[in-house]
Amino acid sequence: MKKNLLGFTFASLLFTTGSAVAAEYKIDKEGQHAFVNFRIQHLGYSWLYGTFKDFDGTFTFDEKNPSADKVNVTINTNSVDTNHAERDKHLRSAEFLNVAKFPQATFTSTSVKKEGDELDITGNLTLNGVTKPVTLEAKLMGQGDDPWGGKRAGFEAEGKIKLKDFNITTDLGPASQEVELIISVEGVQQK
């Protein structure tokens, strides 16, 4: 579950774009303007939500040439938080994220395609020692000058990953085989 969340987190970072004249952005996690969230069904009765609190990443963005855009994200899996200490401890164990052996999850984009108002960001997500392709559907939320003399761009992305694809085989029941990723990032343009 946490592993899938990491995958989504990486995916969210992928939703940024770039080109030959693309601007490079650093994800603004220090200003609390970036979130890597996930949700998974609990026994088919409700949604269990979580987040990764410690991650870093960059992206390039060029509206005129999205196919050249790049996204790179690293998530510290130990930072998983579902607002329940015992569950978080279990998610960090070898049954799920195995943070002792695999302390980081990474996402590196391999392609970005514009589909209407959205971007399909495909990349390699490495989670729990397994690397698989993941596609995120992303949308530009806005871009422009900030009040401090800089430039920013913000994206929201969603995607799904299957736990078993990342060697997370704990049986959580038929309703809990996929993790939904919900990523929201704001990047600060680098000079």
From Swiss-Prot:
Residues 1-22 form the signal peptide. Gene3D superfamilies: Lipid/polyisoprenoid-binding, YceI-like (2.40.128.110). Its main location: periplasm. InterPro entries: Lipid/polyisoprenoid-bd_YceI, TTHA0802/YceI-like_sf, UPF0312/YceI. GO terms for cellular component: periplasmic space. Keywords: Periplasm, Signal. It comes from the Bacteria. PANTHER family: PROTEIN YCEI. Belongs to the UPF0312 family. Type 1 subfamily. HAMAP family: UPF0312. NCBIfam families: PRK03757.1. This is Protein YceI.
